[in-house]
């Protein structure tokens, strides 16, 4: 698979030969959906809680006598049928939202995403991205020259100047190949990969 190599002005020059195993795989929408859903589910925290009838504040006194009032029977005010009563199946912070995806499926899903990005022209390769100083303005000007506004940068090692300069830019993220997640790959409009990172991605996924 041939990937576009961009210069500092964002213009296409030479091409980089990449592995077809990683960047030339068929598009598998069902697998990508499964991998993304699992990633989102595993990121969830148990941050919601409701009370059952044991936990709500109530009295155990019987509201009215069993017979003779014409009303429906009632034992105590904590009944789930009553306003202010406990829930029958309450949400709990201990709820487990995790989804398991086999390693082979996860790798295949990432390969399918990388391949589709390459086919759509959203994936490009650069020699390297170097900043002389950790200035957001310098990086913003570089992206403007290259015509980028929403970009995920995958680099072999995260340069400190590059990381500090990118923190205040919206829709910009910088990761190493091992931390590239399926949701970010789909979310950003463009994915820039350094030449050294391409080799690392092939090593991780092939």
UniProtKB/Swiss-Prot annotation:
An example Gene Ontology CC term for this record: ribonucleoprotein complex
InterPro entries found in the cross-reference section: Ribosomal_uL4, Ribosomal_uL4-like, Ribosomal_uL4_dom_sf
Matching Gene3D superfamilies: 3.40.1370.10
Gene Ontology terms for molecular function: rRNA binding; structural constituent of ribosome
Residue ranges, compositional bias (Basic residues): 58-70
Coiled coil: none
GO terms classed as biological process: translation
Region (Disordered): 46-78
SUPFAM superfamilies from the UniProt entry: Ribosomal protein L4
Keywords tagged on the record: Ribonucleoprotein, Ribosomal protein, RNA-binding, rRNA-binding
Family: Belongs to the universal ribosomal protein uL4 family.
Function: One of the primary rRNA binding proteins, this protein initially binds near the 5'-end of the 23S rRNA. It is important during the early stages of 50S assembly. It makes multiple contacts with different domains of the 23S rRNA in the assembled 50S subunit and ribosome. Forms part of the polypeptide exit tunnel.
Assembly, per entry: Part of the 50S ribosomal subunit.
Protein name (database record): Large ribosomal subunit protein uL4
